[in-house]
Amino acid sequence: MVKALAPRIAAVVVGGVLLHLAFPPRTVWWTAIVAFALLWWALSGVRVRRAAWLGAVFGFAFYLAHLMWIQDFLGRDYGPFPWVGLSLVMAGFPALGGALVALAARLPAAPVWGALAFAAQEWLQSRFPLNGFPWGRVAFGQVEGPFLPLAAIGGAPLVSVAVVAAGFCVAAFLQRPRRVVGLVPVVAIVLVLLAVPTPPVDAQDGTRTVAVVQGNAPDIGLGLFSAGRTLRANSLAETSVLADRVRSGAVARPDLVVWPESSLSTDGVDPAVDRAVDALGVPFLIGANYEAGATDTENAVVVWNPGTGAGERYAKQELVPFGERIPLRAVTQYLTPFVALADFTPGTAPGVLPVAGTRVATAICYETAYDHVLRDGVADGGSLLVIPTNNAWYGRGEMTWQHLAMSRLRAVEHGRAAVVAALSGASAVIRPDGSVVARTGLYTADTLVEQVPLRTELTFATRWGAWFEHGLALAGLLAAAAGYLLRRRELSRTSTGA
C-alpha cells in the first residue's frame, strides 16, 4: 500500500513544506497555492480514511518546519520531544481537513466546497484542545500577497479559504484542462481580488506620535528566567536615551510610549518607572507581570501616567498553554521548563484602554493569533492597535517574523494602524493596509518614533467577523455532510441494483 501511495505521500510532504515557505520572513506567498494544489491532487479519488492519513502527513510536514523555533528554544534541555510532539498533535487538524475534503469532493464545484471543508479545521484548531493553538493558520502566510485585503471583509478565515480554494481550483483544472468550466472558480477568485479595494490608511480622528521602546534582552534562552532585573534596566536605559533625543530635538516628543511584554514585574509601585514617565511627561503603556494579589499574577498592559503612576490595565485573556498556564503538571514537567511556575491569572475584560486622548485596542503576544481579542477591543472603541510581545525566549528563529505577520494581518482586518513592541525585536509600526512603516532588528536596543493615524470606521470583519467565521466553518461541515450522504445514496443504489 505504501508503495502505491508513494507519489501521493511525496506530494503532501512537499506541499506541507511549501506551505511553510509561504510564511515570513520569506515573501513567496504563492507557494501556499502550489501546496494546496498538491494536496488536492493527492486527495483526489481516495477514500476518507486514506485522505485523513494523507492530510496528517501534510500537516506534520508543515508543522515540523513551521515550529522549528520550539526546538531552538527547548531542544538543548528537552530534546526534540516538545517540537515533534506538538507537530504530531497539530497534524491531527489537517488530518480532519483531509477527511472533510474527501467527503466534499463528491459535490459539484468540488474545489470550492473542499476549500471550505478544509478551512473548517482551522475553526476547531483555534478552540480545541486547551482553548486551541491557532498558530500557523494559512492566512498568516499571506501578508505579502494579493489575498491580504480580504482580511478586512472576513478576517483570517476568509483569507485562508481563498488561498486553499485557489490551490484546489488550479489543481482541478490541470487534472481536466479541457473542461473550461473548471476555470470559472479561478476567474471568480481573481475578479474578487481585483474588486476588493486597498485598505484606507488616512486618519479619521487625528494622529498620535508613538514611541516604541525596545530595551533588548540577552539571547540566553531559558536563562531569561533570572533576567527580570536586566529587562527592566534595559527598558529604563533605552527610555533615558529617548528622553535625551527628545530634549535635543532629534525626535518629536511622543504622545504615547510603549514598552514590550514582560518589561518588568510590578505591583503598580516603581519609583524608577515613575521618574522615566515623568521625564517625558506623556503616558506609557507598559507590558508587565502584574502582581494583582497575594496569589494572582497577570500578564498585563498597564497605563502608566505622569504624576499619578500606574492606572488602568488589561490582563491577557489567552494564556500560552504549557507556558503561562500548565495543564497536567505531573506529565508536562517533562515537556516544559515553566512547570515550576504558578499559572498566570487570565483576564476577562476586552483589551481596550483609554490613553493619550484615545482608546487603544491591545493584545499581548500569543493572543494576536486569536480572532476575538483585537476584534473585541476595536469594537469597543479602539482606534489604534498596540501589541506588546516578548520573543526573546525563541532566539533568532522564525517565530518573531511569524508573529509580526499576524499583527500585519490584524491591522488590515480592523483597518487600524498597529504598534508592535518586542522585548528583543522585531518591533514595528504598521499602517492600516498592513505595510510596515519602520521596524527594528533582533537583539538590539532601539526606539521607533512614528506618527500613526487614528481610525474609527469599523470594517466588515470587525462588525461581522465572528459570524463570518462560524458561517464558513458551518458551510464546510455541511458540504462534507452532503458529500457523505451523496456517497451513501450511491452505495444504496448500487446494492439494490437501481
Predicted regions: what is each one?
Residues V13, G92, A162, A227-N234, ...:
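Soluble or luminal CAZymes and related metallo-dependent hydrolases
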Residues M1-T198, R396, S407-R410, A422-S424, ...:
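Membrane-embedded alpha-helical bundles of multi-pass enzymes
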Residues F23-L38, A56, F62-L67, Q214-G215, ...:
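Short, conserved active-site loops that position catalytic residues or coordinate cofactors/metal ions
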